[in-house]
Amino acid sequence: MTTNLIWILYRSDSDTAYKETLNCKKIIEGYGKKVLFSEISNETNNINQLFLKSEVLPEITIVLGGDGTVLRAARYLSPKNIPILSFNVGGNLGFLTHDRQILKQETFWERVSNNRFNIQKRMMLEATVFREKNNNENTIKKSFFALNDFYLRSCTDEIAPTCSLALEIDGEAVDRYKGDGLIFSTPTGSTAYSMAAGGPIIHPSLDAIIVSAICPMSLASRPIVVPPESQLVIKPIRGMKQKIKLWLDGSSGCLIEAEDTCLIKKSNHSTSIIILDENHSYYKTITQKLHWASSLNNPNKQ
């Protein structure tokens, strides 16, 4: 990492994130680094402009926002293997972000300028939507990457929002789901939508794919964890009047029509997450974020 270039991406709807961006830029430039920055949101993608402006890739990218901002940034930065250092500025839970107060510490900036930090590799998923043609050949309709999850849900407003989906894993029929949809999650995303749907929490150092049904009509439809090399194929059950949409990390993907097939698998790309704490504990993170064991950490609480 000797390019002396650092990017900053900030949450577009946060004045605080923009002000923090200007402060960070000033400090980083004081260490002899060049800084380029841009806003990021669901509606606008200015990251490609940074790629065009930069003759070299950045050493790291600082992301100022919440987990959603990090997820959006990861889709563009991970294929280039650019490490992400994120801070919770205007976000919510912040499983992927550091406390923004760290930005005020002079020792922090010295560590960043000298590349004194750890990097965690986080598994990503890839989804490819195929369209079946009359000659039974499939053509690629769309491809997407996600750090947290993909999910398929009904997008019909006129009738009850349920959908019927068939799932195959490695060529073997597994289940036919009827309900609000299906979630396909990484271990990083296991504390997001999948957890809300009753899925297990998986340590992010593991590679696995979690399949969780959203409000299934059958009590037999339970979450399942499959190996990372699994090939998961999802097809709308034909003959049903339904419109289904693929979502990635909470952002709109594309419509899945009756003649479409969606293949979900582990991506060849991974997200590089910078961890500043040398004694970082994932269990401490989820205990704090999910308020577990509060009576153990606070002996005065009964």
UniProtKB/Swiss-Prot annotation:
Protein's cellular compartments: Cytoplasm
Binding site for NAD(+): D67, G68, R72, N148, D149, K178, D180
Enzyme class: transferase
Signal peptide per UniProt: none
One GO CC term on file: cytoplasm
Obligatory cofactor(s): a divalent metal cation
Any GO BP annotation: NADP biosynthetic process
Pfam families for this protein: NAD_kinase, NAD_kinase_C
Protein's UniProt keywords contain Cell inner membrane: no
Molecular function via GO: ATP binding; metal ion binding; NAD binding; NAD+ kinase activity
EC numbers for this chain: 2.7.1.23
Reaction it catalyzes: NAD(+) + ATP = ADP + NADP(+) + H(+)
Active-site feature positions: D67 (proton acceptor)
Keywords: ATP-binding, Cytoplasm, Kinase, NAD, NADP, Nucleotide-binding, Transferase
Role according to the record: Involved in the regulation of the intracellular balance of NAD and NADP, and is a key enzyme in the biosynthesis of NADP. Catalyzes specifically the phosphorylation on 2'-hydroxyl of the adenosine moiety of NAD to yield NADP.
Similarity field: Belongs to the NAD kinase family.
PANTHER family assigned: NAD KINASE (PTHR20275:SF0)
The name this protein goes by in its record: NAD kinase 1
Species per Swiss-Prot/TrEMBL record: Prochlorococcus marinus (strain NATL2A)
Gene assigned in the entry: nadK1
